[in-house]
């Protein structure tokens, strides 16, 4: 198909780490698309024991969504605490306590070493029997098309502030790209909705001959678990100002007077 300008918006896909015996698990799922959710929904029963590998946003939202429809939800994560990429130790502990009060079982600092059908052996030596497995350990950028075409690719497709790749007349936007993080000055994949649509708008404007760069991306999340709501934005390296009460925790980080 001939084109004058091309946009690559191939998004991301679930990352499934190598785990011994994974193929022996019959009911195993990712939790990223509507089709994933529907497939999971079809196998759940009130007697189901669900094992979720991954205590990030995707895994914990899955746990919240299915908890009262099944017999047990067990979450495991190799990281030392839940949500380590967006919360500090205090914030993680508050969210974990809230989830555990609702009935979600959480083990951190361990992950699955091997599967034997519906039996999992963890790296800690613990074991877990389950009926349904959900793997939710993160996503990876879909960069294969751009890479095969010869574009510069790191963890994501490398683009400028208007979505231009290293290839002439080829643009990219969204979860498949790397973005400059205004808050930290680093460049990395920022797989969040606001970044995706603002990148897409900038690329579309450039493809139409206009100039509307997007160069102020900031990692941000607004989410809740069982009525405990949280908002995070930016990076956390700097002077900390903390306000904490029994059911409230606020932290403001200042760096270079900002």
Residue ranges: model-predicted function:
Residues 2-13, 53, 73, 128-138, ...:
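Short hydrophobic core segments
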Residues 5-69:
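Glycine-rich dinucleotide-binding loop and its adjacent helix/turn
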Residues 8-9, 52, 122, 135, ...:
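Redox-cofactor binding/interface segments in oxidoreductases and associated redox assembly factors
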Residues 14, 160-171, 236-251:
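FAD-binding beta-loop-beta segment adjacent to the flavin cofactor pocket
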Residues 24-45, 118-121, 127-202:
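FAD-site-proximal beta/loop scaffold in flavoenzymes
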Residues 49, 57-113, 195, 214-225:
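Rossmann-like dinucleotide-binding cores of NAD(P)H-dependent redox enzymes
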Residues 76, 121, 159, 253-256:
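Hydrophobic alpha-helical segments, especially N-terminal targeting/anchoring helices
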Residues 176-258:
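Mid-to-C-terminal Rossmann-like scaffold of FAD/NAD(P)H-dependent oxidoreductases
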């Amino acid at each position: 198909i001939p084109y004058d300008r091309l946009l690559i918006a191939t998004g991301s896909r679930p990352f499934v780490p190598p785990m011994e015996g994974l193929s022996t698990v019959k009911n195993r799922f990712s939790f990223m698309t509507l089709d994933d959710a529907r497939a999971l929904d079809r196998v759940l029963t009130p007697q189901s024991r669900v094992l979720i590998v991954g205590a990030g946003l995707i895994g914990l939202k899955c746990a919240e969504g299915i908890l009262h429809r099944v017999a047990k939800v067990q979450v495991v994560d190799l990281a030392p605490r839940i949500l380590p990429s967006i919360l500090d130790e205090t914030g993680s502990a508050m969210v974990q306590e809230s989830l555990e009060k609702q009935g979600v079982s959480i083990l951190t600092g361990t992950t699955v070493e091997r599967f034997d059908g519906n039996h999992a052996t963890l790296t800690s030596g613990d074991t877990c029997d389950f009926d349904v497995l959900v793997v939710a350990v993160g996503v990876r950028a879909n960069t294969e098309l751009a890479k095969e075409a010869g574009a510069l690719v790191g963890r994501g497709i490398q683009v400028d502030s208007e979505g231009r790749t290293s290839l002439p007349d080829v643009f990219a936007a969204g979860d498949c790209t790397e973005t400059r993080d205004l808050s930290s000055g680093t460049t990395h994949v920022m797989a969040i909705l606001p970044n995706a649509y603002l990148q897409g708008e900038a690329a579309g404007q450039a493809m139409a001959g206009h100039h509307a760069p997007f160069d102020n991306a900031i990692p941000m999340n607004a989410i809740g678990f069982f009525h405990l709501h949280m908002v995070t934005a930016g990076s956390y390296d700097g002077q900390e100002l903390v306000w904490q009460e029994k059911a409230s925790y606020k932290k403001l980080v200042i760096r270079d007077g900002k």
